[in-house]
C-alpha cells in the first residue's frame, strides 16, 4: 500500500504557500536512502523511488508547495523569503501518530527563488545528511535526512559543482519567520489560523489555556531554551540563527554553515558570513531569546485583553527564558563533569573549567572524553587528559577541586553519567570536508564511513579511533559556507 499523505498545511489558506511542482533533473541516481528513518515514520523505499526523490515524479497524494515566510537575517528585516529551492511534497503520519513533513531541497525554482536557480550542490546535501543524522544520534531534536540523490547536472556557484536533491523530514517546516510573514502584512486571520495549526500540531496542551497564544509562546520558548543548551553542551555552533531558521517545533533546522568547536573558545565563529560574531557559540542563548521576542510580537495581537495587559503577560513569559536555559545548561554541564547531585558552587567549578579550556585552546570534545576515561580508569596519567594542556598547572588546580567535589560519589555511577553526556564521536569539520571533497570526485566511501561512525557517538569503536581526533594543523577548518 503506498504511503498515505495527509497534507494539513496545504489545507491552510492559499497565501500561506505557492503550489509548485519540482523541476525534473537529467539523470538522477540514488546515493543514500535512510531505511531506519523510513521505518520510524512509516514509509518504505518503495514509496519513494529515485524518480520521486529527484523531483522527476510525484508520489500519489502529494500536494507540492513552497512555503511563504519572512525573517530577520543577521538582525536585518526581510519581509519575504520563503522556500526558494525547496518543495514540501506533503505530510505522512507515522505509526506513533506523529506527523512528518517530507520536503525536497534543491528541487528547482519557486516564486520565492529571487535570483537563485533553486538547485543544491552535493556538498551541502552531504553536510546536512551527516550532521542532522549525527545530531539525532546525539539525542538532540533535529530535522532528519531521508535520502540524497545526485542529479547528473552541475550547479554553478564559485565553480561548477555536482548537483543533488536532498530529502528532509521534519515535524514541520513552520518557523518564527512564518509568523512574521503574516504579522508584517497585518493579517490577523492568517495569524489565528497559523497559531491554531501550530497548537494542534505541536503544542496541544496550549489549547485549553486561557490565552492559547501566550501558552504557545511559553512552550516554544522552553523547547528553544533546552535545544540551545543541548547544542552548546556538544560544542555545536548553528552559524545562522536567523528567525527563518528557528523552527517553531524546537528542532534544529538548516545546517548551512554549522560547525562543531575544536579548540574551545566561547566567541568561536565558523560561518564565513558571520563577520561580527553575532551567532558565536556563547551568543546562541541570547539570539534564541531575541528570536522569541520576535515571535511574541507576532502573537501579541491574539491576546484578548488590553494591549498593556497583553504586553505585560508576554514579557513575563519571555523573562523566564534565561532561567529555563540556565537550568538546562547547568544540569548538562553537571552531567558532563559527573556531578551526580547538584550543589552550590557547581556552576563556578564548570565556569572555571571553560575559562581554562578557552585560555589554552583545548579541544572541547576530546577533553570531556578523556576526563570520562580518567574516571573509568581512576588514572590521570593513563587518560591523557594532561597532554591536552600546554601548561597543566591550572588544570591540576582545577582537577584537585573537582576530585574533592566528586570524592563521595560512586565512581561507577559517575562514569556512566559522564559516558552518556560526553560523546566520543562528533561530525568534526575536517572529516566533513574530507567526505564532501571525495564525494565531489564520486568517491562516496568517506561519506558512508562517517555515517557509520557517527551513528554510535557514545560507544568505543576501536577500529575507528582516528575519527575521535581533532584536525592536524593542515586540516583545520576555519570557515564554513552556506552553500546556497
Q: Where on the chain are the PLM-derived regions?
A:
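Hydrophobic HxD+1 residue recognition
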Residues: 240-241, 246
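Short, mixed-charge, low-aromatic patches
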Residues: 8-12, 86-90, 150-155, 246-255, ...
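ATP-dependent phospho-/nucleotidyl transfer catalytic cores
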Residues: 125, 154-238, 249-355
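Short, contiguous strand/loop micro-motifs
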Residues: 21-23, 117-119, 214-215
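Active-site-adjacent bridging/hinge elements
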Residues: 9-13, 100-110, 195, 199, ...
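Conserved ATP-binding subdomain of kinase catalytic cores across diverse folds
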Residues: 27-30, 35-209, 248-251, 291-292, ...
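Regulatory N- and C-terminal appendages and interdomain linkers associated
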Residues: 1-69, 275-484
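Short, functional N-terminal and low-complexity linear motifs
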Residues: 1-8, 19-21, 97-102, 161-166, ...
Amino acid at each position: 500500500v503506498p504511503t498515505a499523505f495527509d497534507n494539513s498545511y496545504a489545507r491552510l489558506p492559499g497565501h500561506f504557500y505557492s503550489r509548485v511542482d519540482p523541476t525534473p533533473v537529467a539523470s538522477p541516481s540514488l546515493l543514500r536512502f535512510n531505511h531506519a528513518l523510513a521505518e520510524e515514520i512509516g514509509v518504505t523505499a518503495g514509496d519513494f523511488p529515485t524518480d520521486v526523490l529527484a523531483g522527476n515524479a510525484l508520489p500519489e497524494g502529494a500536494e507540492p508547495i513552497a512555503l511563504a515566510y519572512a525573517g530577520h537575517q543577521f538582525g536585518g528585516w526581510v519581509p519575504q523569503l520563503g522556500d526558494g529551492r525547496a518543495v514540501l511534497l506533503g505530510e505522512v503520519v507515522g505509526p506513533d501518530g506523529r506527523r512528518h513533513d517530507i520536503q525536497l531541497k534543491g528541487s528547482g525554482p519557486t516564486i520565492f527563488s529571487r535570483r537563485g536557480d533553486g538547485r543544491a550542490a552535493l556538498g551541502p546535501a552531504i553536510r546536512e545528511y551527516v550532521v542532522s543524522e549525527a545530531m539525532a544520534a546525539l539525542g538532540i531534536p533535529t530535522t532528519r535526512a531521508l535520502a540524497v540523490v545526485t542529479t547528473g547536472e552541475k550547479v554553478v556557484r564559485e565553480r561548477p559543482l555536482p548537483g543533488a536533491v536532498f530529502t528532509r523530514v521534519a515535524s514541520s517546516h513552520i518557523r518564527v519567520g512564518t509568523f512574521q510573514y503574516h504579522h508584517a502584512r497585518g493579517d490577523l486571520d492568517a495569524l489565528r489560523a497559523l497559531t491554531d495549526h501550530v497548537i494542534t500540531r505541536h503544542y496541544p496542551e496550549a489549547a485549553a489555556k486561557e490565552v492559547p497564544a501566550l501558552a504557545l509562546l511559553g512552550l516554544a520558548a522552553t523547547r528553544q531554551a533546552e535545544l540551545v543548551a543541548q547544542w552548546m553542551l556538544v560544542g555545536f555552533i548553528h552559524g545562522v540563527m536567523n528567525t527563518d531558521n528557528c523552527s517553531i517545533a524546537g528542532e534544529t533546522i538548516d545546517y548551512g554553515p554549522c560547525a562543531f568547536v575544536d579548540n574551545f573558545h566561547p566567541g568561536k565563529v565558523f560561518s564565513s558570513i558571520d563577520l561580527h560574531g553575532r551567532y558565536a557559540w556563547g551568543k546562541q542563548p541570547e539570539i534564541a531569546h531575541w528570536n522569541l521576542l520576535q515571535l511574541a510580537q507576532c502573537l501579541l495581537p491574539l491576546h484578548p485583553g488590553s494591549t498593556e495587559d497583553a504586553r505585560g503577560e508576554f514579557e513575563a513569559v519571555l523573562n523566564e527564558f534565561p532561567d529555563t536555559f540556565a537550568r538546562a545548561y547547568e544540569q548538562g554541564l553537571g552531567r558532563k563533569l559527573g556531578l551526580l547531585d547538584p550543589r552550590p558552587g557547581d556552576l563556578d567549578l564548570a565556569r572555571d573549567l571553560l575559562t581554562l579550556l578557552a585560555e589554552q585552546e583545548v579541544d572541547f570534545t576530546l577533553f570531556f572524553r578523556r576526563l570520562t576515561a580518567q574516571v573509568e580508569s581512576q588514572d590521570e596519567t593513563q587518560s591523557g587528559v594532561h597532554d591536552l594542556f600546554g601548561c597543566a598547572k591550572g588544570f591540576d588546580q582545577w582537577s584537585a577541586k573537582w576530585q574533592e567535589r566528586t570524592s563521595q560519589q560512586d565512581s561507577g555511577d559517575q562514569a556512566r553519567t559522564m559516558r552518556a553526556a560526553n560523546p566520543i564521536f562528533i561530525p568534526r569539520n575536517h572529516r566533513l570536508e574530507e567526505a564532501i571533497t571525495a564525494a565531489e570526485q564520486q568517491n562516496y566511501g568517506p561519506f558512508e564511513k562517517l555515517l557509520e561512525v557517527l551513528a554510535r557517538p557514545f560507544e568505543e569503536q576501536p577500529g575507528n579511533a582516528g575519527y575521535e581526533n581533532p584536525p592536524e594543523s593542515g586540516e583545520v577548518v576555519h570557515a564554513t559556507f552556506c552553500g546556497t
